Swiss-Prot record:
Lineage of source species: Bacteria, Bacillati, Bacillota, Clostridia, Eubacteriales
PROSITE patterns documented for this protein: G_ERA, KH_TYPE_2
GO cellular component terms listed in the entry, alphabetical order: cytosol; plasma membrane
A Gene Ontology BP annotation from the UniProt entry: ribosomal small subunit assembly
Quaternary structure and partners: Monomer.
The protein's name in its UniProt record: GTPase Era
Record Gene3D superfamilies: 3.30.300.20, P-loop containing nucleotide triphosphate hydrolases
Residues that coordinate or bind GTP: 11-18, 58-62, 120-123
Region G5: start-end pairs: 149-151
Originating gene: era
Primary location class: cytoplasm
Keyword GTP-binding in record: yes
Residue span of region G4: 120-123
Length: 295
């Protein structure tokens, strides 16, 4: 009997949703950064075994939106919990239950599918803190399963996947077995560049960064030639991104190229230009151009 179903991962920003998904898949498909709100789109990734297929929906973290992009991210996360077979609520033991957690859990109470509590980053906590966190969350919601994990190290992740398989109904193979994501290759490329920009810039530039792939061509010898616009909101941000004598932009380009070559499995030439688009996160037309469709 073949089993298949949809699993969505929800939680506050920066609790490790993308890290968990990337570990399960063994591929870097969802942007990972130490900054919150780095996942901006619902990304479906597909894990296929001999007798099962799990379609994961990786979502933006749910938070109080401050601009139209934020509204898109929150609505995207809420929509992802509809018509799924299992919800994984991901959180960390070293953080108290906040308004954001209660907001998410309240929105899940009407769901007919089972909800798991997945307590991530237990390797960074203490047994006492983990136990207290389990007690707190159990008093807020009737979880079907509680699974402590360390996603970055893979601890207990196999156990979590095995439990997920038990929730799958009998069903078809929704995607070909060699397909691991439903997003276009260009999208993954743009996410890689955005992640490297966030990592290189650290706290120097806030989240007002977007990536627009201007050109992506593959030559006869297999080399990809990629041209990218890195979009920011202020002229002062542009100067920071470029850096002294262009050193910061060079660093972003070099780290992006390395990761792109790993993903595309071939040589890559990447050129990055920095463009200022003031208040782009509140510009509905520009958001559409960048792939953030209004919900």
């Amino acid at each position: 009997m073949f089993k298949s179903g949809f699993v969505t991962i929800v939680g506050r920003p920066n609790v490790g949703k993308s890290t968990l998904l990337n570990y399960i898949m063994g591929e870097k498909l969802s942007i990972v950064s130490n900054k919150p709100q780095t996942t901006r789109n619902n990304i479906q990734t597909i894990l296929t075994g001999d007798d099962y297929q799990i379609v994961f929906v990786d979502t933006p973290g749910i938070h109080k939106p401050k601009h139209k992009l934020g509204e898109y991210m929150v609505n995207s996360a809420k929509d992802s919990t509809n018509d799924v077979d299992l919800v994984l609520f991901l959180t960390n033991p070293d953080e108290e239950i906040g308004k954001g957690d209660k907001f998410i859990l309240e929105s899940l109470k009407d769901k007919k599918c089972p909800v798991y509590l997945v307590l991530n980053k237990i390797d960074e906590s203490t047994p006492e803190r983990v136990a207290k966190s389990l007690e707190m969350y159990s008093s807020e919601f009737n979880f079907k399963e509680i699974v402590p994990i360390a996603a970055i190290k893979g601890k207990n992740v196999d156990t979590l996947v095995d439990l997920m398989k038990t929730e799958l109904p009998e069903g078809p193979k929704y995607y070909p077995e060699d397909m691991i994501t439903d997003v276009p290759e260009r999208f993954v490329v743009s996410e890689i560049v955005r992640e490297k920009a966030l990592r290189c810039l650290r706290d120097e530039v806030p989240h007002g960064i977007a990536v627009d792939i201007i050109q992506m061509k593959q030559s006869d010898n297999g080399t990809y030639h990629i041209e990218v616009d890195l979009i920011c909101e202020k002229d002062s941000h542009k100067g920071i991104i470029i850096g002294k004598n262009g050193q910061m932009l060079k660093k972003i380009g070099e780290t992006s190229r390395y990761e792109l070559e790993r993903f595309l499995r071939t040589k890559v030439n990447v050129k990055i230009w920095v463009k200022v688009r003031k208040e782009w996160r509140d510009n509905q037309n520009l958001l559409k151009e960048l792939g953030y469709k209004k919900k």
